[in-house]
């Protein structure tokens, strides 16, 4: 099988496991527990990995006419983004009358500017990723129209950082798109480098990069939260750590012929289903408990219930959702 089926699905699986676990911890009020914050400090770069992967496996974003390309990206990303978001909103607002009746407030603040300021939906906040992914693909398509313009992507992390310093002014949370484009092109570049050198050379370089990442993340730790385009610590150190971690892990696991890891591999292979499904489940569980006057906040035992329950439900839903193109983005080829 191709390296993608092993290396990238393994890493995608780890990303999804980390993301769902993070959201469960936050829902249960355990997001600031010390041991968990350490986990986040060592895995903060995982969301950027999806953009890196898209660039690595890019077969040419400029091979199709612009109209056809936009339609294809709309079907694969924007329609699932809207569909998953609307489903989340239906679940969220279905419980709103009960919350107002019982607690005299909507539990979480509601505002009209949420519609244009953010790309997330009430009830399914992680959908921001699909919108940013969609915009990234479109921008890259037009960048590729101009020969040599792709190298401007080297400056895009700085653009995202400046936007962060100025309060992330772009609507629809588009401030992180520049980081997405940078990692998209980094994926393309790293694949090109890996093809030009021997497997043993890539293994050695990757090990050096991983060791450098481990050292630098201790000496000059910085973090980047892609969902809100937020930088913590030194900008240059954060970018260096992210590049070393992602390129090092991809280079190493691709070169050592990583064997198939059943559960993680499956989650990574069907990551879209887990991604769009888990958050509405968490809201449903939370609001059901609140409806009966019981909170899941600061209850560690709920973490041990929710994590296996969510993964089991998402796994059960894989064949169901993947047959629905407007949710999975898997449309029949004409």
Predicted region positions:
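Alpha-helical transmembrane segments and their immediate juxtamembrane cytosolic regions
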Residues: 1-334
